[in-house]
Amino acid sequence: MPSASVKLTPNPKNIYIAPFDTSTAKWMVGRDGIELVNFKEDFQTNFTHQLQTRLEKLAPTEMRWVNDLPDHGWLVTGEFTTVDQGSRALRTAVGLGFGETTLQTTVYVYDLDVSKTQYILSFRTGVPDPKHDTGAGSGSFPAGLSALGEPISTATGLGSGLKLDTTRTCREIVAILAQYM
């Protein structure tokens, strides 16, 4: 558990990303065996690439593995906790939050100037706020609204799926880290 007195060094020269752990997540994606293994690998790769692209807006960003870390910068890693592909058929036919997808992560941020073994910041993404959650739609946004408050079509299933949840999760991570720049 990080100490409340230890803070992230602002404006790191570099941000590093280690692949998020896929081993402990609850995977509800309609696959098993080698198909599930391949899905997890592809999902992790796509997620990491999108996160790297978005973190580049804050500082130069590159992939690193935990056993090959420099002495300065931030390391962003974490674990997928829930990956639920939902039901495209229900999203398309019924809408209104039925068949929703879910992507939840726990993110750990290490300040390599302070420690390579103890994270400084931890937060969860994709977890609805019970005070504001309507119980409908992916993530914590009301059914029929995107993360930007723009209307989405529930009739065609647009604005749904793990691809959108991945984009939303990466944006959420970057928005939180931007507060520490």
Regions found by a protein language model. Give the residues of each.
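Short beta-strand->alpha-helix linker/helix-N-cap micro-motif
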Residues: 58-70
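Surface-exposed short loop/turn segments
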Residues: 67-135
